[in-house]
Amino acid sequence: MYLIFDTETTGLPRDFKAPITDTDNWPRCVQIAWQLHDGMGNLIESKDYLIQPEGYDIPYEAEKIHGISTDLAMEQGIPLKDMLIEFKEVLGRAKFIVGQNLKFDTNVMGCEFVREEVENDLQEMPVLDTCTEDTAALCQIPGGRGGKFKLPTLTELHQYLFNQPFGSAHNATADVEATTRCFLELIRLRNYSSIQLEQSEKYFTEFTQTNTSSIESIGLTHLNLKAESKKIR
């Protein structure tokens, strides 16, 4: 099964190469969303949590991006450890973790596991990323390093695959839904190899027979977190 997830955080690390044990370096997770799908793309589980800030405030610069204020996270969030235990459980049901530029999210979550001393297999999970040289070659957007095509943003990839904009970035639920749609469409278009997916050629035939046309969104309702934060001020 495929576990697609995304986080919103308090900001960026000082050093992107720092280990996840460097708890002073990595930002805090203030929202996580995930979807678990079976091999044919069927939705098994969808979850979304705000995380109560414990011992820190969400910087206003971060709030301006994702809309999650400290007050909103305290009022509507759950304790970090509760989320980590549930996330660990769903990790155990997945074969792959999937995301857009996923290394950042795995490091953020890995560091949160370290902080709470929760054992987990996140760093050992096989990764399928939607932001790669393969998707860069697919979208063919100029401006990459060394004359290469640039790595596509989620918005750019979504626009290329479905010829429609995606304007809800920086809400983890919306980002996960868009990433999931792109990921499953990339399977349908055979942008991933049988080796990458650890499948036989028969898998792609079954997948395209199950998904005969472009992948559709599952139609989740995404809260306007900026509006929610304003309500409680």
Question: Model features per residue range: what roles?
Answer:
Residues 20-26:
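Short consensus segments that form the blades of beta-propeller domains
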Residues 8, 23, 112:
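Acidic-residue sensor for enzyme active/binding pockets
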Residues 63-86:
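Metal-dependent phosphoesterase signature
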